[in-house]
Swiss-Prot record:
Keyword field: Amino-acid biosynthesis, Aromatic amino acid biosynthesis, Lyase, Tryptophan biosynthesis
Gene: trpA
Family: Belongs to the TrpA family.
Function, as annotated: The alpha subunit is responsible for the aldol cleavage of indoleglycerol phosphate to indole and glyceraldehyde 3-phosphate.
Pathway: Amino-acid biosynthesis; L-tryptophan biosynthesis; L-tryptophan from chorismate: step 5/5
Annotated Gene Ontology cellular component terms: cytosol
Name used for this protein in its record: Tryptophan synthase alpha chain
SUPFAM superfamilies assigned: Ribulose-phoshate binding barrel
InterPro entries in the record: Aldolase_TIM (IPR013785), RibuloseP-bd_barrel (IPR011060), Trp_synthase_alpha_AS (IPR018204), Trp_synthase_suA (IPR002028)
Species of origin: Caulobacter vibrioides (strain NA1000 / CB15N) (Caulobacter crescentus)
Length: 275
């Protein structure tokens, strides 16, 4: 299974002429049981693919929202192994929705690439995004993941020039993740007019679907990106819901799934009437 789930999902989306809706949540925020409850509810709320962050003490690419989520995850005792356990528990009831782990190199390095890849495949992980692993240094990780059929998904940014792009997309599989705004997650907003040519350029360079994230917070922004990209990724807006619901002692799962559902509807309707 593994990476095939990603390929099948994007093929199905293409057949339906719509972009995918990709959700991001942090494992262990605010606790493991809530994360599992949210994961189980996301597909019915409209998530086509799920990104699951594993907490790290120095998440340098993240804005304040995800940094706080990482701190809450660590405080709840979440680890990389605990994150894999959540995926395995999710897989007991869902064999179709792709799950991509997203995080930083250090915890993966500490496990050992081959050990991590084998455990991730066994748990039912389909892809991995490592924010701080440049392509020049990624071959050992790529080798381990490819041996288990797990996609290594690369990040490309507005600053990725033509000289750099071939290195970025080399050995990328599943999809390319376009960081639509320079800087950290969840702070600035994506501009759909800038996104369209960037998506086209990345599709040509990689031959893969392109998901766009970092800066999509509202249904309107999600719909604008979904018109031109193969998928729209929303993270900070969902994590904000988790944080505020937990602070107010509200039902976290209910609140985050409601927000996900609003965003999913916007993504699904973005191309209605187009061919």
């Amino acid at each position: 299974m593994t990476k095939d789930r990603i390929d099948r999902r994007f093929a199905a989306l293409k057949a339906e002429n719509r972009a995918g809706f990709v959700t991001y949540v942090m494992a262990g925020d605010p606790d493991a049981a809530t994360t599992l409850s949210v994961l189980k509810g996301l597909p019915a709320a409209g998530a086509d693919l799920i990104e699951l962050g594993f907490p790290f003490s120095d998440p340098m690419a993240e804005g304040p929202t995800i940094q706080r989520a990482a701190q809450r995850g660590l405080k709840s005792g979440m680890t990389l192994q605990g994150t894999l356990d959540l995926v395995a528990a999710f897989r007991e009831g869902d064999q179709d929705t792709p799950i991509i782990l997203m995080g930083y190199l250090n915890p993966v390095l500490n496990k050992g690439f081959e050990t991590f890849a084998a455990l991730a495949a066994k748990a039912g992980v389909d892809g991995l995004i490592i924010v701080d692993c440049p392509p020049e240094e990624a071959d050992p990780l790529s080798d381990a993941l490819e041996a288990e059929g797990i996609a290594l998904i690369r990040l490309a940014a507005p600053t990725t020039d033509d000289a750099r792009l071939p290195m970025v997309v080399r050995r990328t599989s599943g999809f390319v993740y376009y960081v639509s705004v320079a800087g950290v997650t969840g702070v600035k907003s994506a501009d759909a007019a800038d996104v369209a040519p960037a998506v086209e350029r990345l599709r040509k360079a990689s031959g893969l679907p392109v998901a766009v994230g970092f800066g999509i917070r509202t249904p309107d922004q999600a719909a604008a990106v979904a018109k031109v990209a193969d998928a729209a990724v929303v993270g900070s807006a969902l994590v904000d819901e988790i944080e505020s619901a937990a602070q107010l002692n509200e039902n976290v799962t209910e609140k985050v799934l409601l927000k996900a559902s609003e965003l999913a509807k916007a993504v699904r309707s973005a191309r209605v009437g187009t061919k």
